[in-house]
Amino acid sequence: GQMCTCNSYRNPAYLTKVASSIDAMSGGRLEFAIGAGWYDQEYKAYGYEYPSAGVRLKMLEEALQIYIAMTTQDKASFEGEHYQIKEAINQPKPLQKPYPPLWVCGGGEKVTLKLLAKYGDYGNWDVDVEGFVHKSKILKKHCEVQKRNYSEIKKTLHTNVIIGDNQKDLDSKLKRIVDVTGIPEEMYTSKPLVGVKE
């Protein structure tokens, strides 16, 4: 499946019910990855409102709280600025306890990494090796503030591997990918694992 679902695209109570059912049906194999959303063109393509980054991050934190409440409580209630649930029942519960591993995706240093420190089991960052080391240090500081054991959180690196036999082949592959995704070529060519065979 995809690396990370965008919180803005589904009501978090509904998404939690879907995730719980998938975990139950799969014998406890779901890993739940969610982020605040970032790609404005995708929002526009599917007719979703594209709130400011601050609003999307507040929505993500509320969604994380709903996910945890609905997977661990018989009847969950939550009153937030963006989402509300009242005695929401989530059955079947996920098989994994307390809930399927929670990936908090994104590398924003002030808020997203704080949310990872507070709620997440896994983090995933779209950076180079130096950026990975830097994000890890920031996460560690957030863990200290949250009184969270930093070593409990698994840190992962997201990168694209695109290798061409030669420059012409690489350019052709990049063009196909850009045509399909609409993501600018620079988002790929700035990564360390994009190039020609040597």
Descriptions of predicted regions:
Residues 1-198:
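Active-site-adjacent structural elements that line small-molecule/cofactor binding pockets in enzymes
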